[in-house]
Amino acid sequence: MKRRRIDVLCLQETRWMGCKAKEIGERIKLFYYGVETKTNGVAIAVAGTLKEHVLSVNRVSERLISVRIATNEGFWTVISVYAPQCGCPEADEMAFYDELDEAIKSTPESDYLLLLVTRDFNGHVGQDRKGFERVHGGRGFGIRNQDGERIVDMAEAQDLAIASTFFMKRKSQKVTYCSGGQKSEIDHILVRRNDLKTIKDVKDVKSIPGEVAGQHRPVVADMCIALPKKTKTNVEPRIRWWKMTKESQKILREKIVETGLPDPSGPIDSVWASAANITLKCARDTLGETVGGRRGDMAAWFWNENLQQVVKAKKNAYKIWQDTKSLAALNDYKSKKKAAKAAVAKAKNAALDEIYKKLDTSQAEKFVFLLAKARHRNSLDVTEVRTVKSGNGIVLKDPTEVKERWKQYFSHLLNQEFPRKERISARPVVGPVQPRSVEEVRKVMKKMKIGKAVGPDGVPVEAWKVLGESGLLWLTTFFNNITRSERIPDAWRDSVIVPVFKRKGDIMDCANYRGIKLTAHTMKVYERLLDSRLRDMVEIAADQFGFTPERSTIDAIFIARQVMEKYREKNKPCHIAFLDLEKAYDKLPRTLLWEVLRERGIPEYMVRTIQDMYGGSTTRVRTVHGTTSKFEIGVHQGSALSPFLFILTLDTVVKNLMEGPPFTLLYADDGALIANSKVELQDKIREWQMTLADAELRLNLKKTEIMSSIEEPGDVSDISGTMFTQTKEFQYLGSLLSADGTVGAAVRGRITCAWLKWRESTGILCDRRCSRVLKGKVYRTIVRPALLYGSECWPVSKTHERMLNTAEMRMLRWACGFTRCDRVRNEDIRTMMQTVPIQLKLLEQRLRWYGHVMRRPSHHLTRRALEMEVPGKRSRGAPKKRWTDAIYKDMKEVGVTTDDIQDRALWRSRTRTADPANMRDKR
């Protein structure tokens, strides 16, 4: 592509397996699709100047793939086609042409150009253009055959021009296939007839073996369309905090101490500005900073000048052989080809040896996961989008308009508030200011993670950790100064929003992006101090599991499954409404927040401090075209304090509606209401709807769904009469619940999720140079937790265990490079990967969770759900397997009783039979 200056290259019969993207060097990105049989296969390679403008990739089949690219004047759709060969069943040919017709018809008419590249169409369109003058130029090659008639008919029906027939060329520039003395033109380029004027030339060119199959010659088209201009993105230099070592930490600490931080008791704004400047200056001098701009091509890092000369000599030898056809030239080409191949392999292996040696060390664990993440990112079709849609659906391409659209979207999202009913304001609680202690700050600093993106001030938490005790003393005094003054530095009010695509929906729609907000790290430390104080002063209802210590998603999932299981056991109807609040975090009214804080008895000085933190907040949106201008926001979304303030507000608003577990379950803004009948459930939903509306919050009617274990007549509707969606399965907090209470759907869902995680990690798991021990570590840390999420709540059967074991063994065999035809035993595979059978891991997780539940007090919500009784009798016949049945069987297998539960060390030693995957398992 580089030699011919090709921007888009369509490939067929690639015979690669999988469907993803791949960086192949020289900033070229390859989008491909292939099946497990490694037959057929299509791909499209896009040059570096265009890959950033790819909007979507549509992989129809192993014979059809399309890419849509944004241009200056519109959009360009490229379709790569590999038609069925002679002898293929007629049904396959008909299915192929149906898919091709649908792909062409689905391309928007407004697209600037549709380029259809085909290979092995086996159709000779010939020179005769009679009856097809609009789509055939009369300058083809050979005589039209039956397959050629089909091509011309399709071109006529779709108004596509066969581009090569409109250009007068030599015979040698028309022939695209040559074998056994037979020459023909079977590869064609088709464009919309109205866009034929953009095609300036079409011809075939000589290829070099290794680039194209020997019998085929590539077809090249010169087109005149306005491609996107190369835009220069201003990238701000960054301090190399990630390069910090123990030695550089010592140097940085000495420089800051020598320079001296300002007195933390002085004016807040000037103190912080001075402290930030001193810290950043010392860090630049010690660690250095990046220069910004685009990184170079990292794929060909082993390519040196010597290799370039060897490969160039091989190409020259091939050209000489093609011109002379002499035996001496052929032998010379073969020897140079062999030498070039050996030289490339030697250079690449030598360069890779050091990297893989580093991967096998115990210190390289973080590097392994960074490498897997980077390789996964390179396999994504679209990594950045330069065009978005306006509120009216108009596509915006101008950088200024794109930035303005992002600003408009987030400004509306973070400032919109619904009308609400005023609450009776509580009297302010007056009390003395409680200063922060050094121990409180130290405890919070331990929870702060390093390596996170910094806010606009550029000061990360690493800077304070480097200073050690002196940094803690300075921060404690400064935070107490903020508390007394009841205001934060103005520099902390600014933030940056980074839009992240949710991987679903239209990629050009701003609503399909989640805004990640970057704020000052030091402010997050102060917010965590406030958060800990607030949690000590108020108590959150037992129904709320989100952002609360010692409560998790597994608690809520376990309670929901236990309730459904017990209702099923007694053959009683169980109706669940899964509630979702509409943009709850983004539209939380600030005035409601102050009223709630005073109502819950929070001291007024803390209320005023939080008010100041939320007042005058501004933000900017970071886009691929640069950062937008500042705009004010009403909701201080994304801070460390916001989650607790949200659940505190929701807890106060709906406190009179809480029935307690297991009939009301909340995880932040996701709720579940359980009732015995649809009428009762409808009354509950409407009551919640009215209460939330009074607090300026709304239910998302599209995402609120109803699930019933036993079908009953009638529907459930809201206040306005809108019917809620009835469902048989619902994804609750990541675990799939079924109306019949079984876990089969959940098992299948986790297997699907595990395969997604597997594909994200194939950069390591499918790398032949990585050791199997390293692959096993990656599998146990990334893939298996996704496979077994929520499994501690499953009463799995032998069938479910076989499903999980089959999925796991396929992954492990694939990682080892074996198939079942190699006849390698499962036990040997697990030994290589240091991974125990998944049945043991399931047993361990169930018993670990059972011990955790039973050690809790009897009034705890999980204990109450486990021990609750539903009135009625069990149905006749074989009873369904219960979770406790699986537990008693597990206990018998490992040799423990209920008397051993309170002895945590004994219980752990007896039940831990599987390999540890994470820190929780190792404890």
How would you label these PLM feature ranges?
Residues 82, 410, 427-644:
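Conserved pre-catalytic core of RNA-dependent polymerases
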Residues 88-91, 126-144, 583-600, 671-695, ...:
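Catalytic palm subdomain of template-directed nucleic-acid polymerases
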Residues 19-28, 167-184, 431, 697-728, ...:
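Short, conserved micro-motifs composed of acidic
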Residues 1-342, 349, 353, 357, ...:
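A shared catalytic/ligand-binding motif for oxyanion handling
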Residues 9, 228, 232, 244, ...:
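Surface-exposed loop/turn segments and immediately adjacent short secondary-structure elements
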Residues 240-284, 309, 316, 721-794, ...:
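Basic, alpha-helical interaction scaffolds
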Residues 82, 216, 455, 494-497, ...:
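Catalytic palm active-site di-aspartate
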Residues 107-115, 530-545, 643-674:
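Active-site palm subdomain of RNA-directed nucleic acid polymerases
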